[in-house]
């Protein structure tokens, strides 16, 4: 296995509104946003204080979610509102990210227990795969590639890994940048995994054959947390620290940043992309949390408030018909956003619920 290399690309473009004096930047408001015409429905998680963390789309269209503090996975039937919970194997495993495979199994990261698990929804049986390195104690965001290989980030362990579901073999690669905190992840049209380095101002990609890591430098102070990949393979990410939406062109290294409507303290977090190419994310630093839609064609924003307040939407997942699933951690709810999105192109969503495998 090749060792990781750092080949930062630093071409950067910033929208004019980012050039603010240091004394005025903190108080600056974000750009004006239009009213977002969506319907948001929410359901209570049956187990109290479960902390629903990530949502995912099941093969049958159901809303799956992790219950990080209850050690369960949950399934919502959006048509009936019925919720079923599935207890997991290892106590206090801290289920975090999750994703469905082509057979309908639900794979999740055991963020507190150094493992990846697979739930068979038909039987409730759980199969676990322990990390081969004790330093890889907190697997984070999982995503399948088109070959059916499960890729994942390891946040505190500062690694990226791959798991072959057929053999159970796990390979890990260390990120060269110290304390990079690998976070959100996605796969582009060429099968190349990209990921956020939340501990620094970088994005990165990993070669699926050699495991070589190449990093892309973002503007100073940026902290990318979640990401999605558009049909043109440009990478959109939320800048949690400074309140921006960002876009990286991996071919040229050019980065463009837009201030989020909620301003520099809006803490953009969970995100997804719908089949019409619209980028969606939530602002966790405003109360109530917002659902924000960004139109890449017009570079315009629209927003709506989450009825329950949201309590921090840590991730989002888009269905094939343009609906959005959300998990509202702090208020112990899961939600559905009806967007009326119309497909225009095949979209590769770089979140934990993508079904491209």
What are these regions (language model features)?
Residues 72-75, 114-118, 158-162, 202-205, ...:
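A short loop-to-beta-strand structural motif that recurs across blades of beta-propeller domains
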Residues 41-45, 84-87, 127-131, 169-175, ...:
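A short beta-strand motif characteristic of beta-propeller blades
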Residues 311-357:
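Blade-level signature of beta-propeller repeat domains, shared across WD40, Kelch, NHL, RCC1
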Residues 25-38:
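Blade/loop signatures of beta-propeller domains
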Residues 77-81, 120-124, 164-168, 207-211, ...:
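Short loop/turn segments that connect beta-strands within beta-propeller blades
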Residues 48-60, 91-103, 134-147, 177-196, ...:
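Beta-rich, blade/repeat-based domains predominating
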Residues 63-69, 106-112, 150-156, 193-199, ...:
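Conserved beta-strand positions in repeat-built beta-propeller and related beta-rich domains
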Residues 41-71:
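Beta-strand-rich domains and repeat architectures in extracellular enzymes and scaffolds
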